[in-house]
Design a protein with these regions (language model features):
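Signature of the first transmembrane helix
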Residues: 6-65, 96-103, 127, 158-162, ...
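Alpha-helical transmembrane segments of polytopic membrane transporters and translocases
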Residues: 30, 42-59, 254-273, 302-303, ...
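Membrane-proximal transmembrane or re-entrant/amphipathic helices at the cytosolic face
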Residues: 444-521
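Interfacial segments at transmembrane-helix termini and the short loops linking adjacent helices
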Residues: 4, 106-124, 315-352, 392, ...
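Hydrophobic transmembrane helix module of multi-pass membrane transport proteins
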Residues: 20, 52, 89-234
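Interhelical loop/hinge segments that connect adjacent transmembrane helices in multipass membrane
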Residues: 1-7, 176, 192-232, 279-295, ...
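N-terminal membrane topogenesis motif
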Residues: 1-26, 78-79, 85, 208-224, ...
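Helix-loop junctions and terminal segments of transmembrane helices
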Residues: 59-75, 143, 261, 265-305, ...
């Protein structure tokens, strides 16, 4: 494994880039939630959902995972250059086939997703699938631990997309088409540039004999990806087809609110966990070979959990304030879903980290078994909860279904590679977090509801809506919630959850950051 200094250096760069990069989607959320109706936001979410299953079926997602694994396990620089162009050429073929067949069967996809807009669905799918031209070169950049290049490229793409979205959606008022045009321009331009760079770095000719080995690696991921898609899509599909809503427009609007809550919480995951995971997924193959690997893997999950719990608690405490301040009134009901999505991401974090064992040991078929065993629980809880409770029932159903899934995965991964998880410390961390969240409920909302009717509020200009939201802010509840966040940090610090090494590292990082800002000598 690289030195700890190198590990934290790359993590810091990925982290800063992740935070800055996620600011762009956060800036775009008010744009989407004020210029797009919930039905349009729901349509964008369904396009992303459909592209996920297409990526899985046509191995586009699997090829991205293969890029990291095969590149890191290549034994020479020449082999790494050859594997880069080999994987890229296979990816181009997969994308071409996927786009062609998606457009051919667009009528059936639209019938299932109930968007009522086949042209938007077809264009959206083609544009989203083309993002594979960006993801694989970026995966190879990550594998080389070119963290600064990775972050700057991501940042350039995010800022370009933000500027184009603002111009097309707010300036030209093109609505959902403006979002798609901005995505298409950024994807095509950066896809060409990144692909050209990989061609220069790698071998000119692909090793097609490796295609079979790559496909054999990816194929077990297809049924697992399909099962994972069914799990991920069941909430949206249940809302569309059996939710307690009158009419397709109301159901599609519910999907939009559901997608907004999911998006807000996933931003915290991207800012907190994703930068660390980008380094860890490269380093874990080397750690696996060391004698203290079981303890390193277990302690790493605890640290990762601390980071995600902090961000999940933060956004859960201020969920109502965020949604009421930055979103149009038609999106306000999404705030109630955010704490439940925070819990869902914590469960996802457990499962994701345990599933790394399957990739290290090349037993990806076990991942399939775990996901397949989860499906009956998802269907059962969705059938019981969604018809009665709608969006809230869908998120609760996911959380309930994940509990047996994690139990099954824990049993299988421990048989392949026994990890020493600090379960007691994890339980204490979650207990402290739940108590702090319950305490925050006593504080009330930090932003009052508008006294205006829906028609009066809709008649306001954008500037008047912002001023109305600002005037409704209640400072005392917000200060109390910030105090609860501070209390959470104190309890975690002094409860023994963090080791002395973790505390010393945190102090060094904070001190170095203050010195960089010239706040300390």
């Amino acid at each position: 494994m690289s030195s700890k200094r190198q590990f934290f250096k790359h993590t810091l760069i990925f982290g800063v880039g992740g935070i800055v990069g996620q600011l762009v989607p956060l800036i775009l959320l008010p744009l989407y939630t004020n210029y797009l109706a919930p039905t349009e936001y729901g349509t964008l979410d369904l396009i992303a959902l459909a592209s996920d299953i297409i990526n899985t079926v046509f191995l586009i997602g699997g090829i991205r995972l293969a890029a990291m694994t095969f590149y890191k396990q290549a034994e020479s620089e020449e082999a790494r250059r050859r594997i880069a162009i080999t994987i890229s050429s296979l990816l181009w073929l997969a994308i071409a086939i996927a786009i062609s067949l998606s457009i051919f069967f667009i009528d059936y996809l639209d019938l299932f997703l109930k968007t009522g807009q086949k042209e938007i669905l077809a264009c959206g799918l083609a544009i989203t699938l083309l993002e594979g031209l960006v993801t694989v070169p970026m995966t190879l950049t990550q594998a080389r631990l070119e963290s600064l290049r990775f972050v700057l490229t991501n940042l350039a793409m995010a800022i370009s997309r933000m500027v184009l979205c603002i111009y097309f959606v707010a300036g030209l008022e093109w609505g959902i088409w403006g979002v798609l045009y901005a995505q298409a321009m950024v994807t095509i331009v950066f896809g060409i540039l990144l692909t050209y760079r990989e061609l220069r770095l790698g071998s000119i000719y692909p090793d097609t004999s490796k295609w079979r080995e790559i496909l054999l690696f990816c194929l077990p991921l297809v049924p697992n990806g399909i099962f994972a898609f069914v799990v991920a899509a069941s909430g949206r599909v249940s809302l569309l087809h059996c939710g307690p809503y009158e009419g397709e427009a109301a159901a599609l609007g519910a999907v939009g609110l559901y997608a907004l809550a999911s998006r807000l919480v996933s931003v915290t995951y991207s800012m907190g966990v994703t930068p660390i995971q980008r380094v860890w997924t490269v380093e874990m193959y080397d750690v696996y070979k060391t004698p203290d690997a079981p303890h390193v893997f277990g302690n790493f999950l605890l640290r990762l959990l601390c980071v995600q719990v902090f961000f999940a608690l933060l956004i859960s405490l201020f969920a109502t304030e965020i949604v009421r301040t930055v979103c149009d009134r038609s999106y306000h009901d999404a705030a109630a879903l955010i704490p439940l999505f925070g819990l869902y991401l914590l469960l996802t974090l457990f499962a994701t980290q345990m599933s790394n064992t399957f990739f290290i040991t090349r037993k990806t078929n076990y991942n399939l078994y775990c996901t397949a065993l989860m499906l009956p629980f998802v269907f059962l809880f969705m059938d019981l909860l969604v018809p009665r409770w709608g969006m809230m029932g869908a998120v609760i159903a996911y959380n309930l279904a994940y509990l047996p899934y994690i139990g099954i995965m824990y049993y299988l991964t421990q048989r392949l590679f026994r990890v020493c998880y600090p379960l007691g410390k994890m339980a204490l961390l979650l207990t402290i977090t739940v108590l702090c969240y319950v305490l925050s409920l006593l504080c009330g909302s930090g932003v009052e509801l508008s006294a205006l009717s829906i028609d009066e509020f809709s008649a306001l200009s954008r500037e008047e809506k912002v001023m109305d939201a600002w005037n409704r802010i209640q400072w005392l509840p917000n200060i109390a919630k910030m105090g609860i966040m501070f209390l959470w940090g104190v309890l975690v610090w002094f409860s023994g959850i963090l080791s002395q090494e973790d505390k010393a590292l945190a102090i060094r990082v904070c001190k170095r950051g203050l010195q960089k800002l010239r706040l300390l000598p």
